[in-house]
From Swiss-Prot:
Quaternary organization: Homodimer; antiparallel.
Residues at which Ca(2+) 15 binds: 557, 559, 594, 596, 600, 646
Name the record gives this protein: Protocadherin-19
Keyword tags: Calcium, Cell adhesion, Cell membrane, Disease variant, Disulfide bond, Epilepsy, Glycoprotein, Intellectual disability, Membrane, Metal-binding, Repeat, Signal, Transmembrane, Transmembrane helix
Residues reported to bind Ca(2+) 4: 140, 199, 233
Species assigned in the record: Homo sapiens (Human)
InterPro entries, per database record: Cadherin-like_dom, Cadherin-like_sf, Cadherin_CS, Cadherin_N, Protocadherin/Cadherin-CA
Record-listed Ca(2+) 3 binding positions: 123, 125, 155, 157, 212
Gene Ontology BP annotations: cell adhesion; homophilic cell adhesion via plasma membrane adhesion molecules
Length: 1148
């Protein structure tokens, strides 16, 4: 029993030191418990001690070692420690003071739990003696105090429950003395208290009782029979009462241990001593040792093993053969010496199962197995060292009582699916003993490898027109993993081929990787295409890789050449050539297209039938040329069968019939070579592109300059009829639009200018009028469409309007005039006939002259066109430096748009046809507007002194402008924006010129004759206007300087047959000062001091004869004037003189 407890205790001591790897649990249970008794809940206690138990594991515990596997065990799932059978401590541990069962349990989390179960002893056994009766023979000669050992009682219980004392039936002759052996057991000796006398009593009977330490104590009794014999005076005597010897373990049988010797001085049989084991010597000891009864030699009879038992006690007695012999006793203690006779023993326990398996994804440090090495030897003989042999990705981690095998590198099952490991253990004895154990570690598979294609790029060549379903190629991917991890399936990655899914072109077998064509390929449509094949395994998660497959479609000669030139009708082409064409004349060029490639698409030409003797064909370029000349006697037509064939293995061809006609009307032109139409086409496109580019640059520069000029010039000064006609006569360029004054003219030039004005002024009118009629297809406004409607508002000032048949044209051109004139320019005043509101007149002193017509009458008629009255506009002051936005002016002129339905939009074409001549109309409308202003309005020109500064500079220009150029500030207005009227009509920004006519004016108009009714006399009566009053014009809009040549007035006045119905065009600035009436003149002309021609004209007017009152100028009918001016304008338009061109440039 002690031999079993010592290794367990040693193991527990070693495990206790490994606090980081072990947890100790201690329990106790009483003996004699039935099987299935629950000792403890190890799972609960282990969890409380810090174990990380996985509840999902079916087996939470695994028993590593168990000192009593037949007695106790642990349930692997519940963790309950239970008894397997009834435990008898007396048999398990015998006399050991403590009886402990040790278990080592490993949890699923690789934590080790050491369990110690102490078996508690119960007083369940009573002391017993080896025999039922003890018989003794005591010589009567025994002296008092003689001690005779008695057989000891045996109690299997341990400790206090063992034999504690002996009792003898009370008497006077004998007594008992209790003694203790070295192992703690107690025995009794019979002591002779008094001398014996055999003759008195030769036999005694007593009872000896053995008692244990229980409560109540258990007892065992034995009978003692004492026979008093005759005396043998000398007893054998040992030299020593105790002997101690040692013997090596594994000593062979008959190995002497000790020789005992007891002396007896008696002679004969009384002195002959015999030896024997006496007392309590167990059976195991008797098996190991024996004593020679005659010699007293103790020898070895069994196999001594230090690990089984290393100390034995032998009780030996010696007695003589004489009667009444009293034996002598001694104790022999035999110690077994340990030798290195046990090699280390290696025990391997896998963590997961009986087989050592580990996943290839196990990280370094992962425990795969537990190794326990034991050596039954002691000391250095039992101290063992272990190591792992071989170059393997594992290592051995040693502890005091066990070792672990850990992963020490990267595992790859695909390279090594198993490893053969050898563990070697050796002790420290002399000689050294060692042992080895080999085992196999299986590497389990993980899905750690992607499928790998044999090559990343596959290419297959297939001819077009293949059969759908034809096999193309096979792709192969290998996955070194096992099972589902290594099973590879294939699929095509979705993509597009010519805007169609690739699945409509090819398919793949998911298991074998065979790729098939789903359609018949056409090389002319698709020469090659690519797609990707995806290979993925069946692992979780699945791994995949892809490869590119390129399908090249070879061309097959499946397309017949198609003749494209000359054009065929039902397979026949007709060609005309001159009859006098010579040899080598190019008749036609035969062209054929073949959609195949290479030799399959290379086309050559030939003539197979027909009049081949007259013509030849170039086999490469298809040129058909004459080989002889044709005379007058030649027939008029020839036939040729032209064949175009390709050069495929199976040649395909196309033929056409070419009819060649000889035509005498054509001029023979020998063709020296073929004309490269593509080159001509490219050259033409390049030329057109170059011309367009240059044109765009020119237009951009022109527009940029025009935009700058809009901000530069004072339009109110340059758009007078004087400036316009001056440019036309003198040949000034478009820079005149920047001018704000007229250069002085010499007297000689004055006369020439007057003649030119008289002629070219008429041409301007005809030119403008003629274009207006040419471009007008839509309905015009006639006099029948115009009627006068009485006004509801009474006005004190009325106006007389000069009649003009071209007023409708003026109204039609007003819209264009509004859009084309620069900002701030005056509109045609014939479109602004209205009554001036006296309350809105501005009497500023900045303006010198004021002209007005005074009319008498209760109501002012409104102008009605096509049944729709034109809106009225109130007059308001307008400063010359105030420039409205173009958009505002266009909006304000919307009332007069398209009065005659004429479109003023440019068609974008250069042709001057009836429908697309709007662009030309716009080029002439400016002149028409100016002429109509002259013909329809009689207003005296006025102006003021021009400031002294450069004509090309603005009011804000500085010295640096002449060097660095002008900025936006230079073109800003000089004066702030005036305050306008808040009337609704004012918002529309329509500026009206109100003209007041006096009674004298009415009479003057009437003097022209009752048949000459003008537009100004509609609704007027001659008697309402006194003839004595002089006309006074009140111009509501003018500018600082009004420039008007008097010669122009005289020329135009002559054209009006003496009835002055035309006035110089005034600039758009409100004239605010009144002019005194002068009976000697019809009109007062504004004087511009810098102009000498104006000065001379004023002098002529002041000093010339006064016309009689009956010859006062009346409003003239402009139809007659236009009739006379039109031929002049037509002549100027046809000649396109430089002056006309310059005038067009100015207008545009």
């Amino acid at each position: 029993m002690e031999s079993l407890l010592l290794p367990v205790l040693l193991l527990l001591a070693i495990l206790w030191t490994q606090a980081a790897a072990l947890i100790n649990l201690k329990y106790s249970v009483e003996e004699e418990q039935r099987a299935g008794t629950v000792i403890a809940n190890v799972a609960k206690d282990a969890r409380e001690a810090g174990f990380a138990l996985d509840p999902r594991q079916a087996s939470a515990f695994r028993v590593v070692s168990n000192s009593a596997p037949h007695l106790v065990d642990i349930n692997p799932s519940s963790g309950l420690l239970v008894t397997k059978q009834k435990i008898d401590r007396d048999l398990l541990c015998r006399q050991s003071p403590k009886c402990i069962i040790s278990l080592e349990v490993m949890s699923s989390s690789m934590e080790i739990c050491v369990i110690k179960v102490e078996i508690k002893d119960l007083n369940d056994n009573a002391p017993s003696f080896p025999a039922a009766q003890i018989e003794l023979e005591i010589s009567e000669a025994a002296s008092p105090g003689t001690r005779i050992p008695l057989d000891s009682a045996y109690d299997p219980d341990s400790g206090s429950f063992g034999v504690q004392t002996y009792e003898l039936t009370p008497n006077e002759l004998f007594g008992l003395e209790i003694k203790t052996r070295g192992d703690g057991s107690r025995f009794a000796e019979l002591v002779v208290e008094k001398s014996l006398d055999r003759e008195t009593q030769s036999h005694y009977s007593f009872r000896i009782t053995a008692l244990d330490g229980g409560d109540p104590p258990r007892l065992g009794t034995v009978g003692l029979s004492i026979k008093v014999t005759d005396s043998n005076d000398n007893n054998p005597v040992f030299s020593e009462s105790t002997y101690a010897v040692s013997v090596p373990e594994n000593s062979p049988p008959n190995t002497p241990v000790i020789r005992l010797n007891a002396s007896d001085p008696d002679e004969g049989t009384n002195g002959q001593v015999v030896y024997s084991f006496y007392g309590y010597v167990n059976d195991r000891t008797r098996e190991l040792f024996q004593i020679d009864p005659h010699s007293g030699l103790v020898t070895v009879t069994g196999a001594l093993d230090y690990e089984e038992g290393h100390v034995y006690e032998l009780d030996v007695q010696a007695k003589d053969l004489g009667p009444n012999s009293i034996p002598a006793h001694c104790k022999v203690t035999v110690s077994v010496l340990d030798t290195n006779d046990n090699p280390p023993v290696i025990n391997l326990l896998s963590v997961n199962s009986e087989l050592v398996e580990v996943s290839e994804s196990a990280p370094p440090g992962y425990v795969i197995a537990l190794v326990r090495v034991s050596d039954r030897d002691s000391g250095l003989n039992g101290r063992v060292q272990c190591r792992l042999l071989g170059n393997v990705p594992f290592r051995l981690q040693e502890y005091e009582s066990f070792s672990t095998i850990l992963v020490d590198g990267r595992l790859d099952r695909e390279q090594h699916d198993q490893y053969n490991l050898t563990i070697q253990a050796r002790d420290g004895g002399v000689p050294m003993l060692q042992s080895a154990k080999s085992f196999t570690v299986l590497i389990t598979d993980e899905n750690d490898n992607h499928p790998h294609f044999s090559k990343p790029y596959y290419q297959v060549i297939v001819q077009e027109n293949n059969t759908p379903g034809a096999y193309l190629l096979s792709v192969s991917a290998r996955d070194p993993d096992l099972g589902l991890n290594g099973s590879v399936s294939y699929q095509i990655v979705p993509s597009q081929v010519r805007d169609m899914p690739v699945f409509t072109y090819v398919s793949i077998n998911p298991n074998s990787g065979d790729i098939y064509a789903l359609r018949s390929f056409n090389h002319e449509q698709t020469k090659a295409f690519e797609f990707k094949v995806l290979a993925k395994d069946g692992g979780l998660p699945s791994l995949q890789s892809n490869a590119t497959v390129r399908v090249i479609i070879l061309d097959v000669n499946d397309n017949t050449p198609v003749i494209t030139a000359p054009p065929l009708i039902n397979g026949t082409a007709e060609v005309y050539i001159p009859r006098n064409s010579g040899i080598g004349y190019l008749v036609t060029v035969v062209k054929a297209e073949d959609y195949d490639e290479g030799e399959n698409g290379r086309v050559t030409y030939d003539m197979t039938e027909g009049d081949r003797g007259f013509f030849e064909i170039d086999q490469v370029n298809g040129e058909v040329r004459t080989t002889r000349t044709f005379g007058e006697s030649s027939k008029s037509s020839y036939e040729l069968i032209v064949v175009a064939h390709d050069h495929g293995k199976t040649s395909l061809s196309a033929s056409a019939l070419v009819l060649i006609y000889l035509s005498p009307a054509l001029d023979a032109q020998e063709s020296m070579g073929s004309v490269n139409l593509s080159l001509i086409f490219i050259i033409a496109l390049g030329s057109i592109a170059g011309i367009l580019f240059v044109t765009m640059i020119f237009v951009a520069i022109k527009c940029k300059r025009d935009n700058k000029e809009i901000r530069t010039y004072n339009c109110s000064n340059c758009l007078t009829i004087t400036c316009l006609l001056g440019c036309f006569i003198k040949g000034q360029n478009s820079k005149c639009l920047h001018c704000i004054s007229v250069s002085p003219i010499s007297e000689e030039q004055d006369k020439k200018t007057e003649e030119k004005v008289s002629l070219r002024g008429k041409r301007i009118a005809e030119y403008s009028y003629g274009h207006q009629k040419k471009s007008s297809k839509k309905k015009k406004i006639s006099k029948n469409d115009i009627r006068l409607v009485p006004r509801d508002v009474e006005e004190t000032d009325k106006m007389n309007v000069v009649s003009c048949s071209s007023l409708t044209s003026s109204l039609n051109y007003f819209d264009y005039h509004q859009q084309t004139l620069p900002l701030g320019c005056r509109r045609s005043e014939s479109t602004f006939l209205n009554v001036e509101n006296q309350n809105t007149r501005n009497t500023s002193a900045n303006h010198i002259y004021h002209h007005s017509f005074n009319s008498q009458g209760p109501q002012q008629p409104d102008l009605i066109i096509n049944g729709v009255p034109l809106p009225e506009t109130e007059n308001y002051s307008f400063d010359s430096n105030y420039v409205n936005s173009r958009a505002h002016l266009i909006k304000s002129s919307s009332t007069f748009k398209d009065l005659e339905g004429n479109s003023l939009k440019d068609s974008g074409h250069e042709e001057s046809d009836q429908t697309d001549s709007e662009h030309d109309v716009q080029r002439s409308l400016y002149c028409d507007t100016a002429v109509n202003d002259v013909l329809n309005t009689s207003v005296t020109s006025m102006g003021s002194q021009m400031p002294d500064h450069d004509q090309n500079e603005g009011f804000h220009c500085r010295e640096e402008c002449r060097i660095l150029g002008h900025s936006d500030r230079c073109w800003m207005p000089r004066n702030p924006m005036p305050i306008r009227s808040k009337s609704p009509e004012h918002v529309r920004n329509i500026i009206a010129l109100s003209i007041e006519a006096t009674a004298a004016d009415v009479e003057a108009y009437d003097d022209c004759g009752p048949t000459k009714r003008t537009f100004a006399t509609f609704g007027k009566d001659v008697s309402d206007h006194p003839a004595e009053e002089r006309p006074t014009l009140k111009g509501k809009r003018t500018v600082d300087v009004t420039i008007c040549s008097p010669k122009v007035n005289s020329v135009i006045r002559e054209a009006g047959n003496g009835c002055e119905a035309i006035s110089p065009v005034t600039s758009p600035l409100h004239l605010k000062s009144s002019l005194p009436t002068k009976p000697s003149v019809s009109y007062t002309i504004a004087l511009a001091p810098p102009a000498r021609d104006l000065e001379q004209y004023v002098n002529n007017v002041n000093n010339g004869p006064t016309r009689p009152s009956e010859a006062e100028p009346r409003g003239a009918d402009s139809e007659k004037v236009m009739h006379e001016v039109s031929p002049i304008l037509k002549e100027g338009r046809n000649k396109e003189s430089p002056g006309v061109k310059r005038l067009k440039d100015i207008v545009l």
